[in-house]
Each structure stands twice: as structure tokens, then as C-alpha cells.
Amino acid sequence: RSTLMRSSAASDVYKRQFRNLLKYKAQNIISIIGLSVGILCFSICLYCSRYINSTDKCFTHWERIADINLYTPAEEPYSGTPATLFESLRQLQFQEVEAFTFVAYPRPRSYNVETIDKEELPYEDLYAMEVDTAYHSVFTPEVLQGSWAVASQTPNAVILTRSLAHKIFGLGENPIGKRMTLAQRLFSSPDTTPRTGGTIYTIQAIIEDIPLNTSLSFLQKIDMLILNDSEGLIQFDGRDSMTGGLTFALLRPG
């Protein structure tokens, strides 16, 4: 009998709760929606926090990579570093440093690209990042096709990301050796470069896509790397009087 009474009491409680839900249906719906929005906002904030905190952790040597900054006499940081800084630091030969590298700010470029069918197609706003040859030692990009060693010895060498290579040439094709003709004059180009460009680059390697959460170009997708760029900032005559990129050091283990 006591069991039946407890069962009946529990049933009455459930009925009253159900009636209350029906009676205050609008308020309950608002409460449920509010709770759902709160959980969603918390989840988004947690994801963004983890995303930002994982910046640069995609790099093999992320714990040993140091971002080098310059400061004014008032201890205010400059925006970036000049392209000559990494060259000067290399000459000092710090025992604690394994390598220095310079990465120019990514900028959009326009190219006429030689396709597999020997045609030339125009591509605009391809985000190119000029780097020096030590970039591979510091950031260890995964080379999928071609050779970084060959690219480092080749003037005006282009290293495409996987997604751009697939977009232009398709899956399973080999774009190594294809030409890309610059279709504009850059601010750092020599005076002899026409306004319509004309400088020829060659594709020497394909690398895995660079993640968006890196110090190199936070939330900006990079389409290609440029090595030994005759039109770029590293060979620009006025490179010592301006900032235009980031300088990094790879510290020795320990």
C-alpha cells in the first residue's frame, strides 16, 4: 500500500509540473531559448580561446621560435622589422640561435599562370609571402612535391600551397617547372620593371596549406611563398629604411 501511495504521489507531482509547463509555456520557451543561447555563446568563446591559444603550435619547433621586435627610445614597439635585420643578426653569430629568418608581410599579387595545357590564365589577388631560404629550417613546411633545396637555389622561385595548386592545376597533376608571369609592378620592384610586370617566376615545390592561426598571417590565407624574389622586399634598395615584415629566430634546444 505504501508503494502505491508513493507512486501516486510521484504521479501527482509530475502532473502538476506538466500543468505548470503548459500554464507558463511562453516563459518556459523563453527560458529554454536563453539557456541554449548561453550554452552556444560559451561554446563559441571556448573554441575561440583554444584557437587563439594554439597559435603557432602547428610548427614543429614552435617552442623554440622567437619573434624579434624593435622598440623606440620610448619603449614603443615598431610595426614589424626591416628586411636587413635578419642579415645583421646572422653576422653576429649568436651561440644560442640556430637560424634567423625574415618573412615579408603577405600581399596580393596578380599572375598569368602557365597551365598543364600550355595556356596562360590570369589569376588576381593571390596572397604571396616572400621569405628567405632559412624559412624551411625554422617553420618546417611539409613539402608535398618538388624540392625546397632546388627552390632555395633558384631565382624567383614559387612554392604553392596544396589548395592553390589543386585549384589551378587540378588533382594529380604535376605543376613543378610551370611558369607564373607577374602581371603588375610591385612597390619594391626595380625601376626597370614595367607597370604591367612581366617578371617570370617558376613553380619549384608544393607545400601543405599553412594554418590560419599563425603569427605569420593570422586569419589570412597564404597562397604561395616566394624565394629569391628579384621584385621583392629582401632585394629592394630601400629595405633598410622601412619595416615590411617579421624576423624570427630558431633557438637551439635547451
State what each model feature region is:
Residues 15-22:
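A short amphipathic helical element positioned immediately N-terminal to and/or at the very start
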Residues 132-145, 158-254:
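Mid-to-C-terminal secondary-structure elements
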Residues 75-84, 121-126, 153-156, 210-220, ...:
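Solvent-exposed, non-transmembrane alpha-helical starts
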Residues 102-109, 113-154, 204-206, 221-224:
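The feature marks short, hydrophobic/small-residue-biased sequence motifs that occur predominantly
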Residues 1-10, 14:
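Single conserved hydrophobic/aromatic residue that forms the stacking wall/gate
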Residues 24-53, 63:
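Short, strongly hydrophobic transmembrane alpha-helices
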